[in-house]
Amino acid sequence: MTAKLILLRHGESEWNSKNLFTGWVDVDLNEKGEGEARHAADLLKQENLLPDIVHTSLLRRAIHTAYLALDGCDRHWIPVHRSWRLNERHYGALQGLNKAETKEKYGNDQFMAWRRSYDVRPPDLDRDSEFSQFHDPRYADIPASERPVAECLKDVVARMVPYFTSDIAADLKDGKTVLVAAHGNSLRALVKHLDEISDEDIAGLNIPTGIPLFYELDDNLKPVTRGGRYLDPEAAAAGAKAVANQGNK
């Protein structure tokens, strides 16, 4: 019997539409993003992929997306687990900056290294910055020495994969249909793990907002079909292209 895993990046946020680096800054969905989350629910219903349990981050844009998707599926009553390990990548001192302006200031090579390389972190964010979450009470359980002030994708993999192995995998092995409502980079990290994508090739993977990505997994939780299947392939392709072009004005 195959396990069913649904990955859903949050709908468009207020800062996505402004082309800003968001990271751990807790912005909400905009009107378009709310519509994307409701459309995700329609796609799940059409495929009869009704979640039994949800794993999401501590950020409202992912939590809000999960709520709207579940409400649209009439599954608002199922358990929802929240973990900082599913948070977006912490973009350090880039948080709050416009992507196109950052690219123009630092050049395309540095911009792409910060944005898409596997192991290059952006500059650290000052702990007292208006865009810092270092003193946010929701992260009080993370030891101060481990609380990120900047992350690369490698760091996201290091925090996310243990959560997948310990928590999400247990639900999949119990036969539950699992929805992971998260973020572009935490989902890139998970897809990298599932599909065994190389450190070099992961740079080319872009996750669109609001389109469910469905994986069937075998008894070893390996994908039956590498790359999974988007429930709206055309919209996913267009969305991924838009993500790739975010450094452009």
Swiss-Prot record:
Residue positions binding substrate: 9-16, 22-23, 61, 88-91, 99, 115-116, 184-185
Q: Name one GO biological process term.
A: gluconeogenesis
- Cited InterPro entries: His_Pase_superF_clade-1, His_PPase_superfam, PG/BPGM_mutase_AS, Phosphogly_mut1
Alphabetically sorted, this entry's keywords are: Gluconeogenesis, Glycolysis, Isomerase
Q: What class of enzyme is it?
A: isomerase
| Keyword Nucleus in annotation | no
Instruction: List the EC numbers from the record.
Output: 5.4.2.11
Q: Where is this site: Transition state stabilizer?
A: 183
Pfam families found in the cross-reference section: His_Phos_1
Positions annotated as active site in the UniProt record? 10 (tele-phosphohistidine intermediate), 88 (proton donor/acceptor)
Could you tell me what this protein is called?
2,3-bisphosphoglycerate-dependent phosphoglycerate mutase
